[in-house]
Amino acid sequence: METSSSRSVQVDDWQKNYSVVASSICTPKQKADAYRALLLHIQDAYANSEISQVFATNLFKRYTEKYSAIIDSDNVVTGLNNYAESIFALAGSQQADSDKWQSGLSINNVFKMSTVQEMMQAGQKFKESLLEPADASVVMCKEPTIFEVPQLGVCGGSEEADLLSSSVHGTEKTQAIPGNSLRCSPFQSTLFPMATNTKTCLTSSAPSGESTTATFHRTPLFGNTKKEPQSFPKTSTGLNMFLSNPSCVPSGCENPRERKAFNDSDTINMLSNPTLNKAPSKTEDSGQREDNSLPTFKTAKEQLWADQKKRSHQSQHTSKSFNGAIKKSLGAGRSRGIFGKFVPPVSNKQDGSEQNGNVKPKSSRAGSAEPAHLTDDRLKNVEPRMVELIMNEIMDHGPPVHWEDIAGVEFAKATIKEIVVWPMMRPDIFTGLRGPPKGILLFGPPGTGKTLIGKCIASQSGATFFSISASSLTSKWVGEGEKMVRALFAVARCQQPAVIFIDEIDSLLSQRGDGEHESSRRIKTEFLVQLDGATTSSEDRILVVGATNRPQEIDEAARRRLVKRLYIPLPEASARKQIVVNLMSKEQCCLTDEETELVVQQSDGFSGADMTQLCREASLGPIRSLHTADIATISPDQVRPIAYIDFENAFRTVRPSVSPKDLELYENWNKTFGCGK
């Protein structure tokens, strides 16, 4: 009977996959999955001797070729891209990618490419062929020549400017340029058609008395660009590059129209030959030059250093505007004398704002209510950085918790509603002796919902919830722990009503002894004083809720201040059933009421966390019943629902986390100090 049912399932799967393959509306991914399933069925049938070897070989070859046609196809519509999806998913989730990386490709690099250089040279050859032989009065050479201009006078009328000959790099002969070549020659008139005045000449653009470099870079029409060694002496006047500086217009072009035409022709020539649009760098005494090489690659770390330098320069400029005030600094910049003021290593956000007389900490998740609390008189003696730390890290902004989310512990929930939630919701009714207590202690075995009760108190009463631990209040600096405790209660008074939840309170308020460290003793003393001391007010609506698994280790003074001490026992049968029903309602489960009762009976002594682990282990039963080959091809709908046999297998691996000896200890402590039944 079982064999016939398995064969019918295989036939149904074969027909389903074959219909997917024959369909024209299915995606290549679905077809590839169907082909893989068919190949697996062929292998299983041959392994069970249901088909012959020849028939299995022919079928396997046929479907393998069809499967390969989909996998190896380059067509986007009919093929399956089995690499790009996973690669894009991995590349999209990389955290090390930085938007600070810069590309090494720029416009100057494009002009340095060999193909672009060939195109520019071809254009120059065509431009040269258009010139008449008589107009080619400018000497052209294969290598560029840098001419030194030691003296350049102002030309006017019959005066001419003589240029000294300059040495050419290498073994080439010196070439002299006559004075009239600086005037508007026919070659220059070709480049600048509107500048035809024969009386124009170049003038120095440098003001009198300013020392500049008198070098003239002439870019050739052919050949590579080279420079002469910059070992020439400085002169009193300088000549900027003729084609790259728009201010170097002929002195004779005093007409605005001629000057405009000269600038327009200069721009056109620079666009036609981009290599002429590079101004030479100024020569310094040290002989340093401007680096024209390819831009170097900057990593995210180098870019971060550059940004930090920019911010430091900006902060220096900003600090100078504060009436010459000196900003506090750490490290080598501070005074090391015996009379120097000590600057604490902990960053104080108030230092930068003391000069202006106000405090401006960063905005936190508390929203728009934070500025109103920072101006409160109760926070005037609290450091702003501690207020910011409490608002950002200690204040809890999690989802709300309802009483229905907590299974069992009906007595504890009713007591908490009576003495905590209702007084916080209606403080006008619960006054005087009806006022809420200052502290509540929730003790019991682990995994019974003590933390959920603390969150539910804050959610249902509309109070601000502070979740702290011993690590959030301790510090390696002397006196910082007490300040943090004082700041915590100061912020809580500004955020009334407030609930301060301390998980594992025995680690923070343990019994004080002779061998205890001084810093931990001061933190405990400050906490007890803030909880119920001479400076506290009876009108403060601040509730301290502590949860612990070891109530016998709490200090006597802390136990006295935690007035209501409620025992949170293990969940009863009804509570365990509620946990199982709630968890199984989110999964595919076929448990009957009788089977659920059996699970509840067998889970006697389990905590709430143990019941959750039991259900999680049972939910893995249907997955474990599958074969390894079926996991790769099976769909989620084909996974069978959770059955009672899965819970039976889960009971073999999941054990209760609380021993009867521990339960006896909790019950004895509850009889001695507890406030429950």
Swiss-Prot record:
GO BP field: ATP metabolic process; cellular response to ionizing radiation; male meiotic nuclear division; negative regulation of apoptotic process; negative regulation of intrinsic apoptotic signaling pathway; osteoblast differentiation; osteoblast proliferation; regulation of cell cycle
Gene3D superfamilies hit by this protein: 1.10.8.60, P-loop containing nucleotide triphosphate hydrolases (3.40.50.300)
Reactions catalysed according to its record: ATP + H2O = ADP + phosphate + H(+)
N6-acetyllysine modification, residue list: 341
Subcellular location(s) per record: Nucleus; Cytoplasm; Cytoplasm, Perinuclear region
Cofactor(s) demanded: Mg(2+)
Biased composition (Basic and acidic residues): 281-292
SUPFAM superfamilies noted in UniProt: P-loop containing nucleoside triphosphate hydrolases
Enzyme class, spelled out: hydrolase
Protein residues bound to ATP: 407, 447-452
GO MF term (any one): microtubule severing ATPase activity
UniProt region (Disordered), positions on chain: 203-232, 249-324, 337-378
Keywords: Acetylation, ATP-binding, Cytoplasm, Hydrolase, Isopeptide bond, Magnesium, Metal-binding, Nucleotide-binding, Nucleus, Ubl conjugation
Amino acid composition bias (Polar residues), ranges on this chain: 203-216, 264-280, 347-358
Keyword Hydrolase appears in the UniProt entry: yes
Induction comment from the UniProt entry of this chain: By E2F1 and serum stimulation.
Subunit structure and binding partners: Hexamer. Interacts (via N-terminal one-half region) with RAD51; the interaction is direct. Interacts (via N-terminal one-half region) with SPIDR (via the C-terminal region); the interaction is direct. Interacts with FIRRM; may regulate homologous recombination.
Role description: Involved in DNA double-strand break (DBS) repair via homologous recombination (HR). Recruited at DSB sites independently of BRCA2, RAD51 and RAD51 paralogs in a H2AX-dependent manner. May regulate osteoblast proliferation and differentiation. May play a role in the control of male meiosis dynamic.
Protein family according to the UniProt entry: Belongs to the AAA ATPase family.
PANTHER family for this protein: AAA DOMAIN-CONTAINING (PTHR23074), DYNEIN REGULATORY COMPLEX PROTEIN 11-RELATED (PTHR23074:SF75)
Protein name: Fidgetin-like protein 1
UniProt lineage: Eukaryota, Metazoa, Chordata, Craniata, Vertebrata
